[in-house]
Amino acid sequence: IGEQDQVTELVDVRWHAATVDRDQRETSAGHRGCVIWFTGLSGSGKSTLANEVDKQLHARGYRSFVLDGDNVRHGLNASPSLLESMHGEAFAKRFGLGFGPEARKENIRRIGAVAELFTQAGIITLTAFISPYRRDREAVRKMLSETDFVEVYVKAPLAVCESRDPKGLYKKARAGEIKGFTGINDPYEEPEKAEITIESEKNSPPVLAEQVLVWLERAGVIPSRKK
């Protein structure tokens, strides 16, 4: 531990209560804050579905935001190679996140912490991450109140995901160019108790998004639409 780190460890870091609390923010928004955690293989349709749900929530006047797995890798959870060009090798090695099991664990932990803050702000936070390991998803669930975590398993056969392959990643993994790729040479652990399971190859994104919205209505996250 460096000298600066030792000083930092001695600082009394306390949680500061907000002047405007969560209940007030949720009352203003007209809905509850929560985390909708979309998980599934690469190419299963997580980002597409999360953005479609976000679009429909926004159309109804609700406060929502998508945290996308690719987007956060450009900043908060940037890789060592990306950070090195901006901050140097030492910084990149210390703070950059790769794609091994431990780095993936930290990637999900950080996103869980950000999503929890969004929830306290009364925002419906939609996260789209492969998040292949069950223990990591459950760790995020435990960060939140019991009803604040909604796990959505975006289920699609591996063959379907490979046929989509929008980034060409499966092709590279099959060729041995990518190691530890989920679904090929690293496991994806299916959820055991997902609140919602979506079979993404069976319907269009708007229809699939409607399934999520109906669940949110029944759970009291958002108001039910008047008939």
Predicted regions mapped to residue ranges:
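Conserved substrate/cofactor phosphate-moiety recognition/catalytic segment
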Residues: 51-116, 120
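The conserved Walker
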Residues: 42
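Small-molecule kinase domains that catalyze NTP-dependent phosphoryl transfer to phosphate-bearing small molecules
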Residues: 155-211, 219-227
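Conserved phosphate-donor/acceptor-positioning beta-strand/loop module used by diverse small-molecule
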Residues: 126-132, 144-164, 198
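Conserved catalytic network of the ASCE P-loop NTPase/AAA+ motor domain
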Residues: 116-123, 142-147, 188-191
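Conserved lysine of the Walker
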Residues: 46
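Extreme N-terminal, non-catalytic leader segments
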Residues: 1-35
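Loop/turn-to-beta-strand initiation segments
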Residues: 63, 121-125, 150
